[in-house]
Amino acid sequence: MRRRDFIRYLGLGSVAVTIPEAMHAVPAAATTLCSDKKTKPISGSWFEFQHSAAEGGYWNEALAHFTADQWRRKVFEIREVGMEYLVLMGVARAGKPFYPSKIAPRIPMGCDDPLEAVLSAADECGIKFFVSNDFWGDLDAYNMMLDKGVQTVRFQAMEEIAERYSHHACFYGWYFPNEAMLQPYFVDACVNYVNETAAFAQRLTPNCVNLIAPYFIKEARFDDHFVRQLEKMNIDIIAYQDGVGVNHTSLEDSAKFYEKL
């Protein structure tokens, strides 16, 4: 079996996180392969140019040499296995951008503008992107939420990104990547961070759909206080992380936590 076919079948045999009904359009390949109407195919995933230096390993080294054509081919490959939505994890790493910017020198990559390369490819093949607005500080999510200096740079970057890239048809919205841990609730700093960032995003791109991805639902308490927090947050999509991939939750247990949610 070809690698792409294996990935396609693997994805269609998994259970996706529930997202708004407007986002449940199923590609033709998925419709053909998914015979169980109760199981919704996975139609979105993560995307990144580089991971953190501590964990990136061979991944970072390989992607650092990608040409614009290789990025284009990668986006098309992802679309071919049934993905319709991609969440770009970062437009910068440790304060240096992956795109041409006036804020700081660009991280050396195999093409001049990887962000333009992937968004242009997504326009061609019909993928929608949630575009990140970080990482302009260290990887401590709470520090980045609270640091006003980082917020200033973040907003400058969003202005640049909106000016350079929001004309793309695939620019569906923003991803705010400073992920809050639910222990068992959102901290107040996270609520403020989300609302301030969303307000700025909506001024730049009024039709944007914005997404956050808090973790881990294993420790969350879904009660009236949690609901009140959600009611305060100006956010369109919350993509809850189960933590299976980082061994925080077992695959077998994840279903019951989503059921509680």
Predicted feature locations:
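C-terminal segment of N-terminal export signals and the immediately downstream linker at the start
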Residues: 1, 21-38
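Intrinsically disordered, low-complexity regions
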Residues: 1, 12-14, 45, 91
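Generic detector of short, well-ordered, non-transmembrane alpha-helical segments enriched
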Residues: 2-3, 170
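Short, cationic motifs built from Arg/Lys/His that form the positively charged side of catalytic pockets
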Residues: 3-4, 202
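N-terminal export signals
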Residues: 5-27
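Glycan-processing catalytic domains of CAZymes
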Residues: 33-261
